């Protein structure tokens, strides 16, 4: 198992300087799968499996495993790893106290999914307790259980396991196999396309007209767009990933230049950590090879927990250290007087002329069976969403 080499003439290095690769293949994989039958087993939930995959493929470079206590504490308290690199979200493996009692430091542990599939192994270096309320307050900015990310923290086991992992089997993303590229592959893709500058766009919503406006504004100053939708675990009222993916396909086909945009899945779980998660999203896109990253209004937010531009304000503090250029956009809207999409920076008209678009509004209208106006959504996208949700 070796680290992937960064393409030498590519313009941006991964976070920490090298792209981590913990994927085990060939004879070593066969041997480890056989040996893992004798290892002590732990079952990971879908969130844990997503994290395991992203560590394994280098999306979470420079992490090589689940965090030890020193890194965990530094991350939640200081937004950095113990080696000094910016990192904003704890990537941890929780277990119950009874599970932890059966494990000894130095053990090789087999990591299974809830489907019974073996996904990887962990070399146990550390077991440690943590303060759930403190983690919630520092990472999510609230201790309210109504926050979906905080709820997950409170539901977790009381012990974290730390240590390096090996990824033996990949989670299945069959419905999206054409769009499932690892960071080493996106870097090669950008190189092959001749893109020297690439802007990443994170989304868990269908692309509405405000998103399209922001993406195309960014495309005016870079070579290519990586539309990188999250397809891991989200809230139950979010639009399902398969429906969203079809909507992305149709908008790219009909409204974007073929040689300047690519669709690739981001196989992560959504934490809804707002400003902190914006930093993680930028870091991961840097690992995928993006030189620029878009942060819009209430990035990775939920409800009213974060201010409209709080994520932009926090990420600006770390932009130089992150090493990826952050493109900050104001809330875009359709202006009836201008007759097009705009922001407060480009439109002089009063708010009564503005039609504000958001993923929340799109979801509400679709759930209520309402059609989406063309000022809100491209008709082809609306058709896909209405049909997809009707079939669910």
From Swiss-Prot:
The lineage of its organism: Bacteria, Bacillati, Bacillota, Bacilli, Bacillales. It is an enzyme of class 2 (transferase). Transmembrane segments: none annotated. It catalyses: sulfate + ATP + H(+) = adenosine 5'-phosphosulfate + diphosphate. One of its GO terms (biological process) is hydrogen sulfide biosynthetic process. Its EC number is 2.7.7.4. It comes from the Bacteria. HAMAP family: Sulf_adenylyltr. It comes from Staphylococcus epidermidis (strain ATCC 12228 / FDA PCI 1200). Belongs to the sulfate adenylyltransferase family. This is Sulfate adenylyltransferase. Pfam families: ATP-sulfurylase, PUA_2. Pathway: Sulfur metabolism; hydrogen sulfide biosynthesis; sulfite from sulfate: step 1/3. The keyword Hydrolase does not apply. Keywords: ATP-binding, Nucleotide-binding, Nucleotidyltransferase, Transferase. The gene is sat. GO terms for molecular function: ATP binding; sulfate adenylyltransferase (ATP) activity.
